[in-house]
């Protein structure tokens, strides 16, 4: 029964027959053909409230007449019809024609059926047919409001809208069109017409259980359009049948999905031609049931799907798809064709395009697909699936085409067959491609003539058991991201190529499966792959031959993978295999591979050959290049064997694995070849492996990574390196139990940059023997494992490790390490030897080096270590551990060696025994060191002669309860940077001795625990502790410290701290100096014995001794020793209450800039004995400061020392200081009395000896300086008291100013020594007693010590004056010594003068010392020292002046030298001459202390001995001699006089040269250049005497050189007279030498001894000649020829240098005025007798020395 039957019959207008309806509104339904055939025309506007039905039999098929009925309705002539629901042909044949531009509006449209009770008495011919023609339209709308009838008075009935009615999805609604529910429906849209469906179109639904037999039809032609705004879908029947025909630019547009023919036996035909278009904005699903047929033909048309396309799917379906003539099929998502079992698909694309997201064709078992194309373009962006299913077959044949896919699946399934042939075509896949996937598949892939297969993803061909594939590429390209061919058991692959390019960027898999076989034969080809898998599987066989071809893989390559595989790899003549990643060949049990390389290259990132049990690998090569950038694996498996034999070849690998597996055998031989590995190399891995590695000369193995050989139990390795290189980043040889390794080398270079492991395993053994070799490693592990045995011998060889080295690791291991001369082991990291319980190590280093960052030898319980060395160098920069473990033992014995470590642990463990012995060796630790650390340990350290032990950190020896430690240092140096701990632990015993050595430590701790017993001795040593020096710190502890001839410097000292502690410290000629504090005997009832003797020093910035109550302290400082308490204000001796302290300083010193308190505790008692030259130069010593305390200071028998107390008897204490038998003792800085009161109980007595007052002192009280004693002031003092100086006593103020009340002087007071000025101020009187004296110092001109007496003077004191050569007096005068303001009754007399430490006694009333005379005079009340210069220096200076001037001649001082030629002269005659000279003058001392007059007389005679002339120039030589005398008289400022006398003679030679002497008598005229030179010897006798009874005689010799040059020029005149000008230069040098002269006191006197004169000058001369004409003169005609007068006047300026005016009198320099002088000279020479001349000259010198001289001489020629 129809669900809406009642509504359709109520208010209905039923028409049977023919009729016309125009312009009507029907309030009910309009039913055409209810019981009979009917035919109706509708014109105008008709609005129907309910149903508009044609041939519906009232909606019930049983009511239809037998055979059915026919009814039709035509809406024409632009009519407009509206109806709520329109039904055409419900179980009868109905036709609705809309023509002539008419329009139908309806909310639901049913074409062929709305009934659910279809019966068999009505055939499918009873269809409904809808025809829309000639520009007409049908609109299936949602409501009346969407139509022109929205304002019509007749409103459409919404209640009759069908909501279900067995539609497939269970629902229909307004806006839906249903086609072919109860029979096939037909819709024709023609001639520019339109069908517009607002919601869904339901196609060919049928009735449940009764499918339609004929397909419904939709015909869209001639530019018509069918628009569906919802889905286009099928109904509920088992099959859907539809024929869709489109032609001539027609369009089907579905806004959502198309899903028709979705039941079994569906039959869908789609035909579109002439630019028609089908568009689905959703999915496109047609004929998807079993046994369905889909036939799509596109001819110059388009199919466009915006969703998923599914065509002809279902078992047994047949799909034909013909796309041609420029057609385009586009499915933006997936497209599936013929999916199901037994499907058939025939896809032909000719000059057209197929574009889809994913394309699946013939997916199902037994599917048969044929795809052909010419000029085709196939694009499947996602997947491309063809014939996927068992027994499926695919034939693809394309010519001139392009196939662009995403992923591809072709011929996939059991026994599938695939034939893919490309001719000048390209298949391009952006994803994966699978071809022939399945067992027993058969695949033929043929690429011809520039064809290509380019797969961006994986390409898999013939995958399955017994699958076979034949790939032939001729001048073509096969490319895939991954390429897999023949995968499965018994797969068979044949690949041939000529000029081929095979590319598989990711993987390349060939014949992968058991019993698979692969034959690859390429010539002139290129194979570029990613990863490769060839011949992989049990018993697989692979034959790969390349001839002039290249296989390149960017990834991995696997060949012959599987048990019993057989692989032959042959590379000939310039062929290459280049694998960027791993290459694996013959992997599997009993797999075999034969690799032959001849002049070719095999390269891989990783290369693996023969992996598996009993695998067999043979690799040979000549001129081969093998590269494996990552790994290189050969014969890896139990019982595997590898034979590698290369000559003239290069093997470059990354990681290498050769002969790995139990009982594997490896033979690697390199001849003039190189193996280089950038990664690891592992050889002979496995139990019982045997590995032989032989490197012949010029060969090398260089492994950048790790190299492992013979790894496994019972593995053995034999490595021979003969003048070759073996290197690796890490190297492991023989790793496993009972492994045996033999390594020998001569001229070998072994390098292992990271680790080097040899014979590592229980019972393993290693023998390494190298000579003239180098071993460079990183970390080393040799002989590791229980009971492992290691022998390492280096001869003239070096082992260097940049990391760690571990040898003999394991229990009961035995390790022997021998380094022969010139050998070395250098480990940059840690070195560990014999680590394990009961392990033993023997290390011998003979003139060799052993070094490591950290070194551990014998670490484990009962470990035993013996280390010996001679000339050894041991270095362990970080830690050095030897015999670390309970009951371990260590013996280290080194001589002439060097040991440098970081932290050290030697013999650490309970009951360990340690012996460390150094002899002439150095031991340096940059960190800490523990020796014998643990309870009950025994440690013995001996640092012998010439050794140096340096620990930068802490050193612990014998640390632990009941530990025993002995540390001896002899003739060595010990340097501990931090702390030295010796014997730390309860009841420990520690003994340390340092002899003739140096010890430096940051801290020193000995016996720091309860009941510890420690001792330390040092002799001739230096000990320096920067930090704490702690000894016996613990209750009941005992410490004995004995230091002889040693220096101990420390920071803080704690010696004996604890209750009842006992400390004995003895210093003998030693220094114990703390930069901070020293605490001794800290604790109640502590006992301290401190003995400091024989030039020892005990010093601390703070010293506290006996801090506890009832402490007993005995301190003895003797033998010129020093006790220095430093700068702290808290040093104490006897700080505890009731403490008793005895401090004896005997011939020793106490210093301190801070404070020292003796007897600080209440009721404490202290005695300070300063004896036998004790010195207390302390700034702040307090005595008896506690309540009821008492302190006594006894200073006795002292030659030197210092005492600086600042507080004595403070509070209620009592103190006194007694000096008895002191000499040079010092009482220093700011001494004040204790109670700040009258100091009535404070007495300072200088009973015997010498006491110094140092610093600026201010005190009260009595100071008594008794007979035979001396008190020195070392500062400026102020004394509120009387200074009593007893007879035979001395007080020395040392140049410091003193201010005191008064002086009672019976002894001697020294103001200064002449080096510093002292002023003494007395507020009251100076009382002198007979025999008393005062010494004053003078410091120069009127500077001296002065005593200022405000009161009176009485008695008589002698005065001593002291000075030195530094205190210069320039001019005599009076110097104040004593100033008296009161009564000056006292007298002073001059006793002596001390100069430069020598005393000169008074002579009469004066003292002559040096150049000065001293006398004491009283003027008014004051006393002065008069100082005057002695006269004798003036006599000595003028004696020398006379000697330097005497016998000095210039040319014109010789008579006859002004001679001119005359008419009567014989120019060549020689002559004799005689000359007399008188010279006198006066001079004075530079400060006018002396004035002198002098005179000089000489007579000289000479003669020419030879002359010569050339007629113009004239020369002659002469000799000369003479004698002379001189006298002088000097007067001083105090009218003392001295005279000097000189007598002497001279001998000499002279020479004269004169230019321009004519031999013509009347023409002669002398002018031109002339020279004069002479040499002279002088001898003098001298004497000096004075009114001071001084007399001295001395002889002097002299030598003089003279030179003179001039030029005589005539300046005109009238004969017989002429005028001349004559410039000249005179030079002279005179030297004197003679004996030493001494004054009366024995002082040396020097005198002037050299003079150099340079005197330029000019003379003007006049000549007058008169010839005799008188007869009266005739009688003299033989003698008187003519008279000649030569007169001259001129001068010169004399420059003088040399010592010619100074004398030194016993270091006093006296100098006379000197200056360069201007000398005026004049003279006249007469010739009035034949051949005779007379000379008279005079000269006057103008300077400080007024000098006048005259010369008279004569000359005669003969």
Curated annotation (Swiss-Prot):
The record, for InterPro entries, names: Autotransporte_beta (IPR005546), Autotransporte_beta_dom_sf (IPR036709), Autotransporter_pectin_lyase_C (IPR012332), OM_autotransptr_brl_dom (IPR006315), Pectin_lyase_fold/virulence (IPR011050)
Q: What's any one GO cellular component for it?
A: cell outer membrane
User: Main subcellular localization, coarse class?
Assistant: membrane
Q: Where is the Autotransporter domain?
A: 1465-1758
**Superkingdom:** Bacteria
Keyword vocabulary terms for this entry = Cell outer membrane, Membrane, Plasmid, Signal, Transmembrane, Transmembrane beta strand
Q: Where does the record say this protein resides?
A: Cell outer membrane
Say yes or no: keyword Transmembrane present.
yes
Q: Which residues form the signal peptide?
A: 1-12
Q: How does it sit in the membrane?
A: Peripheral membrane protein
What this protein is called in its record is Uncharacterized protein YuaO
* Gene for this chain: yuaO
